């Protein structure tokens, strides 16, 4: 089926839903029809723009035969022939299956991997880079856990980033980030390679994840600071274990046990929700015989080479020589390119 046939079907379906809603559907039938109509409406609006532009193109084409109108018609045709492909591509993208998590806020988790102290230092810098990115996008960045190492690095950093479309922008950051540079403690000037892992999870709610109290083991203990010394005489730290999956979340950032428990539950729910999403995604990918998405988290996704001032995203072979600006939070060039790459893969998979 060609694109135009699909567009005609979408318009017909929208008109069918509009008529059904006008007839007075009630209950779940009304809710279901309303949701589908709301999803189709913006696509139908774009189709209307396309059809109008195509009509104007035909009219301008006809005017070419008139010597007095030829110059004006040629100018209009040039504009329309540039605009129509853009409209058609916009419609193709609007027709792609939507990830309902894209509009959600997100949980960001960063941990050092290989490289010891240098990995911990870069983890702290990357955590701060995402904080700056959130500020540039107008999002709220709330630190949920910041476990600092003795040298000022980061053992574990978790943040709740709140705003519209946060997950859609940050989901491509999940994976292994590699840093290449000369550590401050390196006397021979040798470049060291270290790695940091980043996980970005869509924020989940009670509707998304059902957790039975009997599935949880909750332990409380005294919070400890750098080097293991106790910094709180009360048992304010909380560790929650989800027994069916073995997932464990520990939280000690707050002085209040209640606040630490609430934060730990928020992270646990996000991790459980992501497990469900990953399982569903794997099933869909197997059905299509191809992996469509943001890549395996176990793979290296990006390299930050400080001596060369270079940042390279290995998934799309994009290199930018502006490492200082990237570390100041300017990730949009990479996010935009990754978004376009994913859209291209989805368009191919959907036959659009």
UniProtKB/Swiss-Prot annotation:
Q: Which GO terms describe its molecular function?
A: translation release factor activity, codon specific
Q: Where in the chain are disulfide-linked cysteines found?
A: none
**Modified residue annotations for N5-methylglutamine:** 229
What does the PTM comment of the record read?
Methylated by PrmC. Methylation increases the termination efficiency of RF1.
Recorded GO CC terms: cytoplasm
Q: Which InterPro entries match?
A: PCRF, Pep_chain_release_fac_I, Pep_chain_release_fac_I_sf, Prokaryotic/Mito_RF, RF-1
Key word Lyase present in the record?
A: no
Functional description taken from the UniProt entry: Peptide chain release factor 1 directs the termination of translation in response to the peptide chain termination codons UAG and UAA.
Which family does the entry's similarity section mention?
Answer: Belongs to the prokaryotic/mitochondrial release factor family.
Under NCBIfam families, the record lists: prfA, PRK00591.1
Return the protein name.
Peptide chain release factor 1
Query: Which species does this protein come from?
Result: Gluconacetobacter diazotrophicus (strain ATCC 49037 / DSM 5601 / CCUG 37298 / CIP 103539 / LMG 7603 / PAl5)
Gene it is expressed from: prfA
């Amino acid at each position: 089926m060609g694109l135009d046939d699909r567009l005609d079907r979408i318009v017909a379906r929208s008109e069918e839903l509009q008529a059904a809603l006008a007839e007075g559907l009630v209950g779940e039938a009304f809710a279901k029809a309303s949701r589908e109509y709301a999803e189709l409406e913006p696509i139908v609006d774009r189709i209307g723009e396309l059809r109008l532009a195509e009509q104007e193109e035909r009219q301008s084409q006809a005017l070419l035969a008139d010597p007095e109108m030829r110059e004006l018609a040629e100018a209009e045709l040039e504009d329309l022939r540039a605009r129509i492909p853009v409209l058609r591509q916009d419609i193709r993208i609007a027709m792609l299956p939507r990830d309902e998590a894209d509009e959600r806020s997100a949980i960001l988790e960063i941990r050092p991997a290989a490289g010891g102290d240098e990995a911990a230092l870069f983890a702290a810098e990357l955590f701060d880079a995402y904080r700056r990115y959130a500020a540039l996008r107008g999002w709220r960045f709330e630190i949920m856990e910041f476990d600092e190492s003795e040298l000022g690095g980061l053992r574990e950093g978790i943040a709740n980033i709140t705003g519209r479309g946060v997950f859609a922008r940050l989901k491509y950051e999940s994976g292994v980030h590699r840093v290449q540079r000369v550590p401050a403690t390196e006397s021979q000037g040798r470049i060291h390679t270290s790695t940091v892992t980043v996980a970005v999870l869509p924020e989940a709610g009670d509707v998304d994840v059902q957790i039975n109290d009997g599935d949880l083991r909750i332990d409380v203990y005294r919070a400890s600071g750098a080097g293991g010394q106790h910094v709180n005489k009360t048992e304010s730290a909380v560790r929650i274990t989800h027994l069916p999956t073995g997932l464990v979340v520990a939280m000690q950032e707050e002085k209040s046990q209640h606040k630490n428990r609430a934060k730990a539950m928020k992270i646990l729910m996000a991790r459980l929700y992501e497990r469900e999403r990953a399982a569903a995604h794997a099933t869909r990918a197997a059905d299509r015989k191809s992996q469509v998405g943001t890549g395996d988290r176990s793979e290296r996704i990006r390299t930050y080479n400080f001596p060369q001032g270079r940042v390279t995203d290995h998934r799309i072979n994009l290199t930018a020589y502006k490492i200082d600006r990237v570390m100041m939070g300017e990730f949009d060039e990479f996010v935009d390119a990754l978004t376009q790459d994913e859209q291209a893969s989805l368009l191919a998979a959907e036959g659009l």
